[in-house]
Amino acid sequence: MSEDLAKQLASYKAQLQQVEAALSGNGENEDLLKLKKDLQEVIELTKDLLSTQPSETLTSSDSFASTQPTHSWKVGDKCMAVWSEDGQCYEAEIEEIDEENGTAAITFAVYGNAEVTPLLNLKPVEEGRKAKEDSGNKPMSKKEMIAQQREYKKKKALKKAQRIKELEQEREDQKVKWQQFNNRAYSKNKKGQVKRSIFASPESVTGKVGVGTCGIADKPMTQYQDTSKYNVRHLMPQ
């Protein structure tokens, strides 16, 4: 999705440059000014949507960030870790440690979900619980946690769908406006001319389909002329 959004953003920017170039010669054109404003808005919307594409687990783990691990962990230890689905801290157990990459495979006690998380993000159980109490979070039952997760996922999905819908609508609106702009530009530059296919039906019974370019449409075909006098034999010496 990020790649598609990046392509769309490049397209919007290219369109904006062309509109700005057109405005340099007609700075008071209301249609062009409105188109410029709309393009600027959709560019900002696309940038905003692109900024949400990277993993959101980075922001959720900010409260656990540090430069070096403050605890020596081993397999089987209990810890407090951030669940990537909602950014909340839960009790978990360390299943495996990768010292080379500084990560640990953990299993959350409440849901049984397994994740791989940086060792820097892990906290001792007591320290993690105290941090939650200090922040005003009261312990919840398993049922309450499940209900909270469902509500969070629902809101997140709705918000994402709405953002995508708004962006797609902006794209369609810009497509129509851009086509209208191009059509008006053609009409102004080609005033009095009619865009016709060379294969269009002739306007008279003597016209020929496919014959009519260069201003000779609907005229009778050129009559055949005898060119035998120019035969190469007449040029040979007698």
Curated annotation (Swiss-Prot):
Residues annotated with Phosphoserine modification: 201
CDD domains xref list: Tudor_SPF30
Transmembrane segments: none
Keywords: Acetylation, Apoptosis, mRNA processing, mRNA splicing, Nucleus, Phosphoprotein, Spliceosome
GO BP annotations, alphabetical order: apoptotic process; mRNA processing; RNA splicing
Compartments where located: Nucleus speckle; Nucleus, Cajal body
Placement of sequence motif Nuclear localization signal: 142-160
Domain Tudor: 72-132
Family annotation (InterPro entries): SMN_Tudor (IPR010304), Tudor (IPR002999)
Pfam families, per database record: SMN_Tudor (PF06003)
GO CC annotation: Cajal body; cytoplasm; nuclear speck; nucleus; spliceosomal complex
Gene3D superfamilies: 2.30.30.140
GO molecular function: RNA binding
Modified residues (N6-acetyllysine): 219
Matches recorded under SUPFAM superfamilies: Tudor/PWWP/MBT
Assembly information from the UniProt record: Associates with spliceosomes. Associates with U4/U5/U6 tri-snRNP and with U2 snRNP.
Family: Belongs to the SMN family.
Free-text comment on this protein's domains from its UniProt entry: The Tudor domain mediates association with dimethylarginines, which are common in snRNP proteins.
Role played: Involved in spliceosome assembly.
Identification of the protein by name: Survival of motor neuron-related-splicing factor 30
